[in-house]
Regions:
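A conserved FAD-binding loop/helix module that cradles the flavin
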Residues: 253, 390-409
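Glycine-rich dinucleotide-binding loop and its adjacent helix/turn
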Residues: 88-104, 163-183, 204-260, 364-375, ...
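FAD-site-proximal beta/loop scaffold in flavoenzymes
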Residues: 215-239, 322-394
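Ferredoxin-type iron-sulfur electron-transfer modules in oxidoreductases and energy-metabolism complexes
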Residues: 1-9, 27-58, 75-102
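N-terminal Rossmann-like FAD-binding beta1-loop-alpha1 element of flavoenzymes
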Residues: 110-135, 249-258
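Feature captures the FAD/FMN-dependent oxidoreductase FAD-binding
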Residues: 105, 110-114, 162-208, 301-313, ...
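Rossmann-like dinucleotide-binding cores of NAD(P)H-dependent redox enzymes
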Residues: 133-176, 227-229, 254-301
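Iron-sulfur cluster-binding cysteine motifs and their immediate structural context
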Residues: 12, 16-37, 58-88, 135, ...
Length: 409
């Protein structure tokens, strides 16, 4: 047995299970204690030291802390760690005079952050008080990245998002909106001391099955559709909607569909419930709104009638499992057609780097994802960093925050 290295900061995080499970290692016992004492502003600021976005994460975090909570070992449910974060944010007094300030005298270093999502904003949050000049470049006309475009406002109100972004940008970041980077080479030529890429995983996966383009206007890519809804480009949908996929994006799509006028919304899952990627509380919220979760359905073809989408053909699956619950065999037992006026594809997201030239010393792996150091998030080209979903594929905001912290260091 090796002696404990108490100089390693991870040692102190591991003492508290929930704090260690949180990617940003938020001091969970500390802020819950402050809430119990009625010190909501102090609880908010303690949260902000590590997770940067207490009000946002108090609503939409994936809650990796809660399965690790020790109360879950002796009670039916863990402490509501995530919701308590929201309590602190919602009840905090004006804290603007207690936020970090950027010094008037800069240190002479210029950093470019590509994308105005949580990873880039965290980099700015950490480096602005140290005298760095931060330029955040965002293709959309508003900051926030996928927090803005893919999380519906009924879950994450715009005023909460705006307030916590303004807390960072207000320290002096230069925000260039509506400015899409077309070439990494040109960005490098601007002479920044470092570049951080936090563009997320902005490309939704396709489902290339027979009939896909027979009525393409009625078949939507999940994240693109959510963005169109967020910016009021789409204001209605058909009465019968099928959502293909059962991750968190699929659940954003199904609940948004109801608010756009759908009468029947079904989320179609290929496997049984224990294999779902979606968070249990997201599933509960959807089912409370009478969304039907249909399991063991593998999509086979889009069905059109007279050139118009009318449904989807599925293989109905059965599975065998071993003693550990793993699938050992699968078989098709029959086919089934379900009616649909619209179909939304939410089967995953991918990174997209057409703007990063491949002759700049930035190496990509077989999945076309940049190779980065797992601690610093620096790519194979010194001074160029990738973080958040752009580095490791779709995860949650709290992971993007932690990547931003580490890259800033």
């Amino acid at each position: 047995m090796q002696p404990t290295n108490t100089r390693d900061p991870d040692y102190f995080h591991k003492v508290v299970d929930c704090q260690w499970a949180c990617p940003a290692h938020t001091d969970v016992p500390g802020y819950i204690r402050l809430i119990a004492q009625g010190q909501y502003t102090e609880a908010f600021l303690l949260n902000r030291e590590s997770n940067v976005f207490p009000g946002i994460l108090g609503r939409v975090c994936d809650r990796p802390c809660e399965p690790a909570c020790r109360r879950g070992r002796v009670e039916d449910k863990p402490v509501a760690i995530c919701r308590l974060k929201r309590v602190a944010a919602d009840l905090a007094d004006d804290y603007s005079d207690r936020l970090p300030k950027a010094p008037a005298k800069k240190n002479g270093k210029r950093i470019a952050c590509v994308g105005a999502g949580p990873a880039s904003l965290t980099v700015a949050n950490d480096l602005l008080p140290l005298g760095y000049e931060i330029v955040i470049v965002e293709g959309l006309q508003v900051p926030g990245g996928l927090m803005r475009s893919n999380i519906p406002s009924f879950r994450l109100p715009a005023e909460v998002l705006d307030r916590e972004i303004d807390d960072i940008v207000g320290m002096g970041a230069q925000l260039k909106l509506g400015h899409r980077i077309e070439s990494m080479q040109k960005l490098l030529a601007e002479g920044f001391d470092a570049i951080f890429v936090g563009t997320g995983a902005p490309k939704g996966k396709e489902l290339k099955l027979p009939g896909r383009y027979d009525d393409g206007a009625r078949v939507h890519i999940g994240i693109e559709w959510l963005e169109s809804v967020a910016f009021d480009h789409i204001k209605m949908i058909g009465e019968q909607v099928l959502i293909i996929g059962v991750g968190n994006t699929a659940l954003e799509c199904c609940r948004s569909s109801l608010r756009l006028g759908a009468k029947s919304v079904k989320v179609m899952a290929r496997k049984p419930r224990q294999f779902f990627k979606a968070s249990a509380w997201e599933l509960d919220d959807a089912e409370e709104e009478h969304v039907e979760i249909v399991v063991n359905r593998s999509p086979k073809a889009f069905v059109t009638t007279g050139g118009k989408l009318s449904g989807m053909l599925f293989d109905v699956m059965e599975y065998d499992f071993d003693a550990r619950g793993r699938i050992t065999a699968e078989r098709i037992v029959r086919e089934e057609i379900l009616p649909a006026d619209d179909i939304v594809l939410a089967i995953g997201q991918e990174n997209a780097f057409p703007w990063v030239e491949r002759d700049l010393g930035i190496e990509f792996d077989k999945w076309d994802v940049p190779k980065v150091d797992l601690k610093t998030f620096e790519s194979t080209r010194p001074g160029v960093f990738f973080g958040g979903d752009s580095a490791f594929g779709p995860k949650n905001i709290i992971w993007a925050v932690e990547h931003g912290h580490q890259a800033a260091i």
